[in-house]
Amino acid sequence: MRVEAVVEVRLTEDKKKVLKALENVFTPVNIREEPSDVGVVLISTCDGHKCLEKLRGAIWRQGIQDAARSVISKGVVGEDTVIFSINKQAAYVGVVSFVTEPGESPLGPITFTVKTSNVRQFIDWLAPRTYRGKVYYEAPPPD
């Protein structure tokens, strides 16, 4: 599994705070900066599920597995890719809030692109189905 997280750092923002927001939900292995017309874009990558443990933990801690599953499932692109976004300001305080509409996150979202050989297993691991608030199947970590 390969994960890429992309987030804008606008000219009015503190790059350290944006990096903190990213690192509250993601453990990047590599981070590179690219210039953009609104500031810079941080592009962070990693291989394997370990880098998404913070995001998974926040989803479980907040008890939003079903909502997360619904949003993430709508982001399936093709047979091996999932794309979803979360609110950068919420991530700064350690909360996961999914962005489903353009412009919903005024300072721009954190956008995740996950490439995996088994999309269903990835979704079942990150945000499993629940029944009456209890997880009834916890998938093993994806490739």
Swiss-Prot record:
Q: What InterPro entries does the entry give?
A: PAB1135-like, Ribosomal_uL5_dom_sf
Highest taxon of source: Archaea
Residues in the signal sequence: none
- A Pfam family found in this protein is RNA_binding
Q: Per its UniProt record, what PANTHER family does this chain match?
A: UPF0201 PROTEIN TK1335
Family recorded in the similarity comment: Belongs to the UPF0201 family.
Q: What is this protein called?
A: UPF0201 protein Pcal_0593
Native organism: Pyrobaculum calidifontis (strain DSM 21063 / JCM 11548 / VA1)
